[in-house]
C-alpha cells in the first residue's frame, strides 16, 4: 500500500489501522451475541415466569461492556425481537457456517474453479432440498465445525 505520493505506508500504521478496524468488529460481534441471547432467552422462558427487565440486566452484565440503564426498556426498541422472535441468532450462525464453507476455498485456493463449481452444485443448487448439515458435510467432506468461526473471532 502506498500514500498519494506513491511512498509505502509504514507497516506500523497499517497494523494500527487493522487493529482499529478489528476492534470495531469485535465490539459489533459482542453486541450481536448480546442481541442473540436476548432473543433466545426471552422466547425460551414461560410468559408467566418471565421478568424482562431482570433478564435483560443479567444478559447485559454477561454479554455487554455497557451497564444496564434503569428505565430504558431496551427490548421495546429492539424491533427484530418481534419480527425474528427467537431466531435473531441466525446472523451469527450464518456467519459461522459461511466461514466454515469458506475454509475449503482457503485450503484449496480462492480461485479454484473446481471448488467453485462443487460449491455451486453441492450448496447453491440443493439449498432447501434437504437438511443443511447434509449438504454442508457433502461439500466440506466432514461435518460442520465452528473452528473457522472461532479462528475468525480470535483474529479480531
Task: Describe each PLM feature range.
Residues 1-156:
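Cation-handling catalytic/transport regions enriched in His/Asp/Glu
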Amino acid at each position: 500500500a502506498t500514500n498519494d505520493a506513491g511512498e509505502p505506508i509504514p507497516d506500523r500504521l497499517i497494523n494500527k489501522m487493522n487493529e482499529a478496524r478489528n476492534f470495531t468488529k469485535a465490539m459489533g460481534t459482542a453486541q450481536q451475541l448480546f442481541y442473540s441471547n436476548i432473543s433466545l432467552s426471552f422466547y425460551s422462558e414461560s410468559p408467566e415466569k418471565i421478568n424482562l427487565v431482570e433478564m435483560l440486566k443479567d444478559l447485559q452484565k454477561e454479554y455487554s461492556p455497557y451497564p444496564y440503564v434503569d428505565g430504558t426498556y431496551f427490548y421495546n426498541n429492539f424491533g427484530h425481537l418481534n419480527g425474528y422472535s427467537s431466531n435473531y441468532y441466525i446472523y451469527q450462525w450464518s456467519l459461522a457456517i459461511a466461514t466454515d464453507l469458506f475454509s475449503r476455498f482457503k485450503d484449496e485456493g480462492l480461485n479454484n474453479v473446481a471448488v467453485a463449481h462443487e460449491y455451486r452444485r453441492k450448496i447453491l443448487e440443493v439449498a432447501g432440498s434437504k437438511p443443511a448439515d447434509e449438504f454442508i458435510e457433502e461439500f466440506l467432506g466432514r461435518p460442520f465445525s465452528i473452528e473457522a468461526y472461532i479462528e475468525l473471532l480470535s483474529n479480531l
